């Protein structure tokens, strides 16, 4: 199973267009969106390319491949305009074909469940062996094993408002995660 994983677009249309090009080039089975898709929120500056209607159009064009979770900036109106479910706090994917056996991905934004890194909440869900906690929210890329919990921790960074210098997304394939720049 191949996934493109993105988070924190925040209505940035040019960034979303670059992400759409990356999705086309990667040709994933599914696209995972970890929240904060349309609104920039009260703590972030307005992205220079802020155009949520364009972002809606782009994301709706791939609705049949999207698995999304709610970020702290999502509102019920977002669900009214997006053609895929986006209001759950988490989702769980099982990659039964992963190298070495089944692999569980716990998908969340980082404000309800998270590893406690940067400004994510420190609230770990119960995870089986061979798991990853995949989250967004911080706008900072992370890919490392958490020694205390024994799970892989992955944050794709932010597509729209990066706080670590570069817009990015992630790719998951057969139990491995990678960051890619936009």
Which residues does each predicted region cover?
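Core catalytic region of metal-dependent phosphoesterases/phosphodiesterases
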Residues: 2-96
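Conserved beta-sheet core of the metallophosphoesterase superfamily
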Residues: 84, 111-182
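Short C-terminal domain-edge/linker segments immediately following a structured domain
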Residues: 34-38, 63-64, 97-104, 136-142, ...
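Short, well-ordered coil/turn elements that cap or connect secondary structure elements
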Residues: 61-63, 88, 100-102, 128, ...
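Beta-strand-turn-beta hairpins that frame and shape the catalytic cleft
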Residues: 1-3, 93-106, 146-153, 174-178
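Active-site-proximal segments of metal-dependent phosphoesterases and phosphodiesterases across multiple
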Residues: 42-52, 81-127, 160-165
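Active-site neighborhood of phospho(di)ester-bond hydrolases with catalytic His/Asp-centered motifs
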Residues: 5-7, 31-36, 66-72, 106-109, ...
